Structures are given as structure tokens and as C-alpha cells.
From Swiss-Prot:
This is Cytosolic carboxypeptidase 1. The keyword rRNA-binding does not apply. Binds 1 zinc ion per subunit. The lineage of its organism: Eukaryota, Metazoa, Chordata, Craniata, Vertebrata. SUPFAM superfamilies: ARM repeat, Zn-dependent exopeptidases. The modification Phosphoserine is found at residue 1168. It comes from Homo sapiens (Human). It is found in: Cytoplasm; Cytoplasm, Cytosol; Nucleus; Mitochondrion. Its EC number is 3.4.17.-, 3.4.17.24. The gene is AGTPBP1.
Amino acid sequence: MSKLKVIPEKSLTNNSRIVGLLAQLEKINAEPSESDTARYVTSKILHLAQSQEKTRREMTAKGSTGMEILLSTLENTKDLQTTLNILSILVELVSAGGGRRVSFLVTKGGSQILLQLLMNASKESPPHEDLMVQIHSILAKIGPKDKKFGVKARINGALNITLNLVKQNLQNHRLVLPCLQLLRVYSANSVNSVSLGKNGVVELMFKIIGPFSKKNSSLIKVALDTLAALLKSKTNARRAVDRGYVQVLLTIYVDWHRHDNRHRNMLIRKGILQSLKSVTNIKLGRKAFIDANGMKILYNTSQECLAVRTLDPLVNTSSLIMRKCFPKNRLPLPTIKSSFHFQLPVIPVTGPVAQLYSLPPEVDDVVDESDDNDDIDVEAENETENEDDLDQNFKNDDIETDINKLKPQQEPGRTIEDLKMYEHLFPELVDDFQDYDLISKEPKPFVFEGKVRGPIVVPTAGEETSGNSGNLRKVVMKENISSKGDEGEKKSTFMDLAKEDIKDNDRTLQQQPGDQNRTISSVHGLNNDIVKALDRITLQNIPSQTAPGFTAEMKKDCSLPLTVLTCAKACPHMATCGNVLFEGRTVQLGKLCCTGVETEDDEDTESNSSVEQASVEVPDGPTLHDPDLYIEIVKNTKSVPEYSEVAYPDYFGHIPPPFKEPILERPYGVQRTKIAQDIERLIHQSDIIDRVVYDLDNPNYTIPEEGDILKFNSKFESGNLRKVIQIRKNEYDLILNSDINSNHYHQWFYFEVSGMRPGVAYRFNIINCEKSNSQFNYGMQPLMYSVQEALNARPWWIRMGTDICYYKNHFSRSSVAAGGQKGKSYYTITFTVNFPHKDDVCYFAYHYPYTYSTLQMHLQKLESAHNPQQIYFRKDVLCETLSGNSCPLVTITAMPESNYYEHICHFRNRPYVFLSARVHPGETNASWVMKGTLEYLMSNNPTAQSLRESYIFKIVPMLNPDGVINGNHRCSLSGEDLNRQWQSPSPDLHPTIYHAKGLLQYLAAVKRLPLVYCDYHGHSRKKNVFMYGCSIKETVWHTNDNATSCDVVEDTGYRTLPKILSHIAPAFCMSSCSFVVEKSKESTARVVVWREIGVQRSYTMESTLCGCDQGKYKGLQIGTRELEEMGAKFCVGLLRLKRLTSPLEYNLPSSLLDFENDLIESSCKVTSPTTYVLDEDEPRFLEEVDYSAESNDELDIELAENVGDYEPSAQEEVLSDSELSRTYLP
């Protein structure tokens, strides 16, 4: 026939035997003939199908009509043997061809024809056994590939046909086996499962699987798989519990465990566990499991299986069941609200903070009454879904699709009169520099030079200036902090002159429209390298006492702060020191061996000095750390708990260790071992000490005096530890404090431990974490700082801890804390530490701490050490925070060469770069990156000088001082994520955001839009450093609306800076960058500055908390050296960006340019389609233990108010403009 002649497959030829036989069979269908002929032809086809793969391939080849002919014959024939032959052919085709041939049969309508055949065959009395076996075998294979199969089977009445066959033929294993396989397929549909349950299928399965017998193991295996599928229905699970089948399953499991000595029946044992897993999805099932002593049974059997690796599936499934059935525990707290209270000046009308304040005092916010009442919803997928649907392309539902919302629309927001309050923060726009001591005393023609002739000193020390800045108060620092009187006096004069000119400068700005026009026309600036003379301040002028404290000279004086601090408590090794007055408060340096410094010998001193030189990459001068200055600054730092202690790491300072710290390899089985130890708490309750050893909520709490108990403390700046409970002799549960005016955001920790013994493995469990996953599961270690090591000239934070993992625990999270979601649990970070020194004082932190006082110290050192002839440096106060701390604003650029008009004009016309950091207090890495940026901008590197001559930098290095000071992770004292307040910041509740946005609005109003805005963040769920930007075209592209994206015309300049950084910064990863705009991020700084202010190059730069999986640092955990390097490389990238955007530069490297024809389609392949965490960021482990305690792999959408970043308006980790709790499957 003509259809058979047009065959595209090479192997299918017109003269092949199979083609002829199929043509003959088709003719029989068209022209009724004797059944003998049909039997003969189908038997021949069966013979070929059984013996030749070529025949099977030809019959299912694309374009072949063989399958249609067979199904047509099957549908029309009345002959039993012909039917059996065709069924046997179909069995051969689907058995050897894999999923493609099964799907091919489904697409040709095979399911419906076979179900109809089953219904017809069931009318025979008795039904033909061979026919039923064949039909059920084929349907069991093709059913999973037909997403409508469950509905089709139910409509055709196939469910009861199959079920009755099993009931009537329990001893006929040949017939029952395929029937059970098909029942398992039916049960994938929840409606079918309930229907079958009503007809006694659950009881029927238990007749087959018990009592214990090794006979017919294959039948038992299929019956158990079917039972597990059936018990996913809550109705069936309740029926099983009511009939006492949970005890039966446990008994059968123990029998198989005892008798299966050679582990040949592991699949049966796993099938029993799968059934238990299903039935314990309901509360009644969990109670029945506990009552039947299931916890102890599964614990003991799983421990006996640990020695055999092939039995790991049994151990893992047992662990899952036990975790699920473990009774939900209450966090041992009176309330989940922070231990510290700060009264807000204004209470928000709506939002989580408003809910917190409106909560009646009698309400228990720690747990819900119905916490364990709800069943775990794991009903089977409904019939409209199948596995293939999960393989669709990645689709981000949070992506913004409204083009009108995507288009940047500059909105003034505030009136020009209102914005004039920021004029005093921009003196560089109006200053004529008549009274400054510039390099050139005489005006001279403005010329371009290609080289910088004068070196610039490395800045190190500074003093914050005092005075009034409009209506914004500054912090007045003590003048005796200055390290060199002459320099301090000169600096004071310099800053005073600038302040005196503010009013005149304001008038100048209003009276010189010509200058403004010149400014507008020069937004991108000119590329000038002004001739410089030698610096007046040299490195030799900077006193060596400002070194960090571990050079040879500093070693001799290191005991100075210890001698002026008297010991308040006598102790042979450790002492509490105090007596430095804080204007009525006492500054305490915790516990320290007062003799430790004096016992250092000269050899150690020399080696320590060399170690420091080798490890600290500041070749041109001392570092920015000054312990005495730090103490003075802490006196003026205002905290809610009124901290009076200083943590030793902040006092001594940190230098990067001179060795690499690789990402930790996770040993196999760590997580299940930790989980087993947690389960032992329930099974062996007498072994649990359960003693409180630290408690912020109990002011009358006394520290236990026993010598073998660790002592804890976090009552210092940025500290966060609320409660510690000793569980076993060397194991402690730690509870973190909520952010102030909040009831969640537990992630950042920073605490002190003392009283340890060497050679003892101490286990620490932080038990109230909230994120669904963590880089602690992927090689990240906590940080530890040892005071003994610091005294031995090793003052650094190091990655520490073994047996680290992160998993869902049995402590219940109330709906109040989970944004209205019930039944959620907390997560545990667990790690084990062996301390090297006896009675040491050690500190642990989530990441490298960087306090507010540290920032103020660094800024003062930078200010006091810079050369005012070359570097224009101002440190103003942007505003005061809610608790009265100043928010610093830094301005850095190059001084004009002279006060000649052209030099001043060029100075004023430099484009702005606006940088900010640390809006999220727990992302301390952002501050280390900012430190690298600040140090580079103030360095004597010729590139840094070119950079200063190219831009004016406005920097807010810490947007959330209060959050940093008080140990918050995500919020300010307002209890809100400040990075979600940029659309409508409140001057009362979000002053730093309100005024930072005001600065940007002011620049927009005077037509001086920044060329770049970048907000530094940290990311807890991804590796490397990367950027998020904003692009209309890429956002539309990822909506899969290709037609719309083609219509969008957009300058691709937003890609230039990330691309430059991918070339020059070893930690930077372009493939992790994303330029999509998501709805949950519309109130972040990045999006608001892009959309409302109009800055095209508006970014968030995310730095990993863990390490890198690419580039130079692949396989290494990130440290402060790498973070500071990233900050410096960002500056270098800005200089290259300047050259690429400057009309005066030529010979540009083409590899760094973004051409318009660099299509989004190709670029999307090397960037991320979302800011959310993807599977490649958190891959599965070889150790397949689900992180959750439930049976379904939940895509944990943390905190309902958090979308995209766990926060009150979005959904992620309470990450950063970055991190998200939703894990989308690609």
C-alpha cells in the first residue's frame, strides 16, 4: 500500500519480510478473511519480533504504520489466538525498546484499546488466564507513560476487574503478579487509590505479604510496592491504622531483618519501610508507630545495618521515618521574640512588626496548639501530571512580566526644596579650593599627562571630624586619638575650611547655572592624569605603634593594655579584666591569661613578625587596626543591651592566615550519624543532662562552677547567642537570638567559649536555624578565633570544625514565626571541635566578624593617614540611626592640581560612583569587600590615583549600623529588612535608607546621576562572587516570550562591568550573574535605583560565605584576603569601565566590549535566569538523606512574607538582594 512505501528509515525497505507481513495483515483487516490467515501472519510477525531486534526497530520506526496495523487488528479480531499473538508482539516491543517504544504505543492509542480488551475479556467466565496475564503485563508497562491512564482505567471499570482477579486467584501467582503490578499503577491516582481501598485492597495486600515467608518473594515485593502506593491515601492509611497493620508491618520487618542474613531480599525490606513511611504521613500513623515501639525497633535495626554499605537505603529510609515520627518539641524559650526590646518611635500599621506588637501577651508564640495535628499532605500527583511535566524548561514565576513596570521611570519622589538638605554633603560640587594647600601654588594651563609622577601613601589612620552638617548630627570623637599631632592639626584645619565654605558654596551652586550645564555635559567625565608632586607625608612619618599589634615593636608593648586593666577575679590561668571606664560603664576584655604576653621569647617575636609580613598584603604601610583606638571608639557605640565587654578578636584584630583553607570534604554518613544521635535522646532519655549553662532570658542566671562545663558568652558588639543547654557531657544545644523587634532571622552567630580541655571532641548544635539548606552542607566551616593562638602571634580567624551538616530537626516553628505557615520545623547546624589549648578563650562566628566600631576605627585611620594634597577625603554623617549611632558617609576623589578654573571644573565634572554595603548585618563579608575597596581607593597605587582622578566616590560603608552592633542577622532595630524599604523608606523607621536614597535623588535632581551604583552583599547559598543587575530585555527573555523580547531595544552597557570583573577578579563568576528583575526584589536598592533614580548600571554584588568552585580559588574557602582583593578588583574594573566609556580612549580590547549584536539568546547561556538558588548550587549528595523530616522533598518557601529572599516582602534566605529560599527545578 502507498503508506508502506514512504518510509524514511534506512533500515525499513519495501522488500523486507516484516513490511510484507504487515501489509498482508492490514489487508486482512480491510477484507474479512478466515482467522487462520490472521493467526499465521501474526505468528510469523511474533517470531520475527522475538528473534530480531531489526524487526522490532522497523515496526516502531518513525513513519512506520506497523503499530497502527497491530492495534487495529487487536481491536477488530474475534480470534483468541490472534489476540494472544498480537499481545505477545506488543510485549516484545515494549520490553526491549525502553521508554521510547512504550510512549510510541501510548501515542497510537494503545492504552484505550487494551483497557477495552480487558473489559471484554472479563466477561468470559472464567476469564482466559493467558489473555489476562498478557493484558495486565502490557498495561502495567505503558500505564506510567500515559498521564491520563488513571482516569481511563477508572472510566472503563478496569479497577474492580483487576482487583477481583487477585481476590479470586490468590494462589495463582502467575496471574496475580501482573495484576499487582497494574494495581500499583492504578494507585498512582489518588481517586483510584481511595476507590480501591473501599473495596478491600489494603486488607488484600496484607494477606499476600504476611505472615513471614521466603516463598514467592517476587510477589511479596510487588505487593509491598503496591501497598506503599495505596497507603499514600490518607483514607487507606487510616484504614490500615484502625486494623492494627502498623504493628504488623513492624513485626514483618523485624522477621525479614533477622532472616535475611545474606541481604538478598533488601528490596522487600525496603518495601516494608516504604509502607511505614506512607502510613506515618498521618498523625494516627505516627502515634501507632510510637505506641508499637517503632522508634526503638527501627533505631536498633538501622544500627545493625550500618556495617553493610549496600543496606544504606534501609538506614536512610529508617532515619526518615524516625525523624518524621519524632515528637515535635518546643524550643526551650519563653518567647521567640528577641531577648532585647527596643521601643520604636513609630509603630508600623501593617506588616510583621505590626503583627508582633499587636500579639496579645497571653499568646504562646513558640509553638502552635495544633502543631502535630495536621497530616503531612503527600497525596499522589493528580492525573493531570506526570513525570514528563517536570522536565519543562526553567520558569521563574516571580519574574516581572509587565513591560511598563520594567521600564525605568525616574521619579523625583521628593521636592527640590526638600532635597536641598543634602547640599552640604556635596561640597565638592561647589568648592573653589582657594584656601587649600594644593600641589600647584600657581595656576597653570590644564594639560593631560599620561603618567602619575608622585607616589601616594597608603592611608592608615584617621580622626572623625566634628561639627554640624545641616540638621544631621555628627559623632564627636576625642582628639587624643590622633596618632601624630601635626598631621591631626593639619587635617583639622583642612576639614574646618571645607565646613566654613558650605554656605558660600550653596550660593555658588545656585548662582552658577553655567557650571551646572558644564557638569551635565560631562557626566561621563574626562580621562585626565594630572601631574603630581611628591607627597609631603611619607611612610616613615607614620608611627610604628599603629601596627596591628604583632610586629616586634608592638610585641613589647602588647602587655600595656593588660597592665592598665586590673584583674577583677583571681585565677592562675585566666582572669577577667576591667577598669577602663565607659563614662560610667566598665569595659571588660573577657578572660585572658595575663602572663601569656610576658612569657613570649625573642625567637617567637621574630618569627611572628615574619609571619605577619608574609600574610598581610599591605606592602606600603601599617594595617588599619589599633587596639587602643578601638577601645575609645567602643565607648561611643550605643547598643540596646548596653554592652560593656569587648570581644578579643575585635580588640586584637585579624590578619589572614598564611595558608589556604580548602573546602571541607564531607565524609559519607555524617548526617545520618548525627540524626541517630538526636533520636537517641528519645530512646535513651536517661543519658540526657539537659542543663542550662547560658541564658539571656534569665537575668538571675548563674554560671555553673563545674570544671568540665564549657562557659559561653556573647555580651559584646555583634554577639548573638541566647541560650545554651548541655545535652551530654561534651554536647551542647545553642539557641540564637531573633533580630530585635522580630521573631525570626536566626543565622548569624558570634559567641565566646571558655573552659575547654584539649583532646576532647565537643559537639555544638545550633538548633533554631530557618533556611531550608545551607553551604554548611557543601564544605563551609564555621570560624574560630583562639586567644592563645593570638598571643602566640597567630591572630586570625580560621575555618574550624568537622562532622558538619545542616538538617531539619524536631523543634517546631510556630505559625507566628513562619509567616502563617503551620507545621514547619527549625533546622540544625551541627559541628564538632577539638580545641588545641587547655582553658583557652575561643570565639565562634558564622563569618568573619566586622563590627561597627571596627569600621569607625578603619575610617579614622584612613582619614588621619591620607595626604590631603593628593586625596580628597571627607567623612560626614549621613544621619543618626534609631539608637543614636552615626551612619558614616565617605567621599573620595583626587584633589585638583590647583585652584585654576579648568582644574576645578574638571574636578567637579567627574562622574559619581555610589557604593553601599552591610544593609544586612549578618553579611559581614560585604564589609570586608568594602574594606578592600576603601583601602585601594586610598592607596598610593598609580591605578588608584587614576581611579580617583576619574570618579567621585560616594560611599555608605554600613547602611545598618544598629543591626550590626546588636548582632542582628537581617534587620535593623525596626524589625524590618532595610533592603526591602527602598521604594517608600520612612525617615523615622528607616533613616539610613531614607537619606541614602535622598542622596541619589539629589544627584538626579542636579543632573549628576552616578555612572555606577553597587550595593555589597553576602550570599549564604551560592559559591563565588557575582552580580545581579537589571535588564528589561533579559527579564522579558526569561518569560519565554521571544516575540516580545525581540521588540525591546536596550543598551547592554549593564553587562560591561560584570564582564570586566570576570576577566580580572579570580573569585568572580559570570555564570552566576543574573540581570532579571523579579517581583519580590522590586523594593530592593538595586531595582529602585535602576527604576526610580535611572542608574542603568545598578548592581548588587554578592560574595559567597563559603568559597569558590571555579577559577584560581577553586576548591578553597573564601577568606578576608580574597574578599578584600575583590573589593580592590572592583575598583580596577571601574577604571577599565571608565576607559571603555571615555571618548578620549582608543585601542580598546574587543573582548571587554558589549556590542549591540551580542544577542541575549547567547548571553543567557552564561548567566543565571534567576536570583534564586538552583539545583547546581546545592546538588544532591551520595548520602541520600532528605534534609527535611517529611517524606516529600519540599521546595521550602521560607517565611510567607519572604519571597525571593526570606524577608517580609519576599521569599529568600533572608538572604540578601540575593538569596532565596525557593529552589526552582530546571
